[in-house]
């Protein structure tokens, strides 16, 4: 990382403009998170939902990924979930339908058309999710006897329109960051959602840590600290694990396979051109954080459907089971989901999560890394890999290398995604105090990966805008 170059690039007006655009959009996003949905008495409903979050694992998870949007019962409650789901649908269809595959390979024009269709599909998905969320929350709040009013048809229509508009605004803000700022807009907004929950989680952890009802910590017989002794050692162990995960994530994100590209000499008149060497870096995890986001979004849908059916039919045991199985197990909801301790059902979500992360890593890499296109470009430019024939042979060679890299990268990413499940389980077994989902798990994985990717893009743009200084 060239920090001196980044500091020097801040003198460039375009660089400053892009940075301020990103910061301004993220501030606007956080302001939107505090605009309530117009559903009856907004304050009463907000207080009732906040009370529900502390009791329900499902609503707690929604609150995390919406950046506190649920606790505020804000217009961005639905978030980017419809847009992500729509993206998954079209990326799957582009591999299954030949005409869509041709369109996706038709350069910028084709990609722009598919992006437009993705946005259009996201709108009805946002409407459906808005209706589902409002119904689930209303039924849950009413059943907990914290609210006693019946929404009118006008309340329903206005609330659904408002939440759908909030999701569309988020989608637009994400695209603004991608086009006019730095980094991937969708990833940045999800990053900001998770980061915004860190202060409240750390505050809750600190409050529990200094709760000395169970005695204070006697350190080596000569120092007594006013902290919960069990929770102190659990927190310390988790802190060490988090540091190790951070270190491993950084190493994995920086790992790459370097392939040397040779360029043939060309004689033009009395001058010779080419004959130089270049490199083609192949990252161990080319897909970045996208597989994790896709896997989380994919697994949240069955939980939403199960919760919706349970709200409509209280006695539906199957719907309740589906909702529990597809709810991410963590320290805060472990004893609610598994009061009798760990059983075979506990392994279903982590196993599916691991499998989806691996599959989406392969799938997304095949989309963003087109070996045939790279091989064709190299052949047109007179480039070749030593010992490999240009053209289809080069494409097959690159495909073989990427398959091997993906095997290790996908397994490593999946394994890291599994570590928080284990640490949360250990934490709840040793202490009744929940550590909080946002301290680890998917949140940590997304935060680290997005931060590294954006630092890399910031570094690249800084080198580009300061290039003239090196001439």
Model-derived features with residue positions:
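N-terminal cationic and glycine-rich segments that engage phosphates or anionic surfaces
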Residues: 1-104, 108-471
């Amino acid at each position: 990382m060239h920090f001196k170059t980044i500091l020097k690039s801040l003198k460039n007006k375009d660089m400053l403009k892009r940075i301020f655009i990103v910061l301004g959009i993220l501030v606007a996003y956080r302001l939107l998170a505090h605009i309530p949905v117009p559903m009856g008495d907004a304050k009463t409903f907000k207080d009732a939902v906040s009370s529900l979050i502390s009791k329900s694992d499902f609503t707690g998870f929604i609150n995390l990924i919406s950046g506190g949007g649920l606790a505020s019962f804000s217009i961005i409650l639905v978030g980017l979930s419809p847009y992500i789901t729509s993206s998954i649908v079209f990326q799957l269809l582009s591999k299954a339908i030949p005409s869509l595959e041709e369109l996706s390979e038709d350069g910028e024009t084709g990609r722009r058309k598919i992006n437009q269709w993705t946005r259009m599909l996201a709108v009805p998905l946002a409407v459906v999710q808005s209706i589902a969320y409002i119904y689930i929350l209303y039924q849950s709040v009413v059943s907990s006897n914290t609210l006693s009013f019946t929404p009118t048809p006008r309340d329903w229509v206005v609330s659904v329109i408002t939440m759908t508009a909030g999701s569309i605004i988020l989608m637009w803000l994400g695209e603004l960051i991608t086009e006019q700022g730095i980094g991937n807009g969708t990833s940045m907004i999800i990053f900001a959602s998770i980061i915004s929950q860190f202060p409240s989680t750390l505050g809750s952890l600190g409050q529990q840590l200094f709760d000395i009802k169970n005695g204070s910590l006697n350190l080596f017989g000569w120092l007594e600290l006013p902290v919960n002794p069990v929770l102190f050692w659990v927190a310390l162990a988790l802190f060490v694990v988090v540091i190790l995960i951070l270190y491993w994530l950084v190493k994995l994100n920086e790992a790459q396979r370097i392939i040397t590209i040779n360029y043939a000499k060309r004689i033009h008149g009395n001058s010779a051109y080419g004959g130089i060497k270049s490199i083609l870096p192949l990252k161990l995890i080319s897909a970045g954080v996208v597989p994790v986001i896709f896997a989380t979004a994919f697994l949240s849908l069955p939980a939403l459907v199960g919760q919706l059916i349970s709200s409509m039919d209280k006695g539906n045991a199957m719907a309740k089971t589906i909702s529990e199985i597809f709810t991410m197990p963590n320290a805060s909801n472990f004893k609610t989901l598994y009061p009798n301790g760990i059983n075979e059902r506990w392994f279903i979500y982590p196993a599916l999560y691991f499998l989806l992360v691996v599959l989406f890593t392969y799938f997304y890499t095949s989309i963003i890394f087109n070996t045939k296109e790279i091989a064709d470009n190299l052949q047109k430019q007179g480039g070749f890999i030593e010992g490999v024939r240009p053209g289809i042979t080069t494409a097959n060679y690159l495909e073989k290398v990427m398959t091997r890299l993906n095997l290790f990268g996908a397994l490593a990413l999946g394994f890291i995604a599994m570590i928080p499940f284990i640490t949360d389980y250990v934490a709840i077994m040793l202490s009744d105090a929940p550590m909080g989902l946002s301290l680890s798990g998917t949140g940590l994985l997304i935060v680290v990966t997005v931060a590294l990717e954006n630092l890399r893009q910031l570094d690249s743009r800084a080198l580009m805008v300061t290039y003239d200084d090196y001439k």
